[in-house]
């Protein structure tokens, strides 16, 4: 995550589960809003998160306290439903420095 041209956060994440067809959709988006202490709800999950920053429909950047491993090929078999799961300390730093409208590039 860059702010004012300076790198603030460089972290491993887990994106959408490729093998289940939940890939995080590639594209250029913008942060829609940010919310503390949200509960993310889907057909088969309800996950409380401390830092929620959606950028496309119900897809966003958030902490994932239930995860112990981030990065690498984790997304292939143990990925998210499309969100960008981020270690809590890094999600907090992003949350505290990001604003509505900031571009998000997913590739």
Locations of regions flagged by a protein language model:
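Cell wall/extracellular polymer interaction/catalysis modules
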Residues: 1-28
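Exported/periplasmic cell-wall-interacting domains
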Residues: 23-28, 33-107
């Amino acid at each position: 995550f860059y702010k004012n041209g300076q790198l603030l956060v460089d972290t491993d994440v887990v994106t959408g589960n490729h093998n289940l067809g939940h890939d995080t959709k590639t594209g250029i988006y913008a942060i829609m809003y940010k919310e503390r202490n949200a509960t993310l709800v889907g057909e088969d999950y309800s996950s409380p998160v401390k830092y929620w920053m959606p950028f496309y429909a119900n897809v966003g950047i958030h902490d994932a306290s239930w995860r112990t491993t981030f990065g690498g090929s984790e997304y292939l078999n143990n990925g998210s439903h499309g969100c960008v799961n981020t270690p809590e300390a890094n999600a907090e730093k992003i949350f505290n420095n990001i604003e509505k409208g900031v571009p998000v590039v997913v590739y």
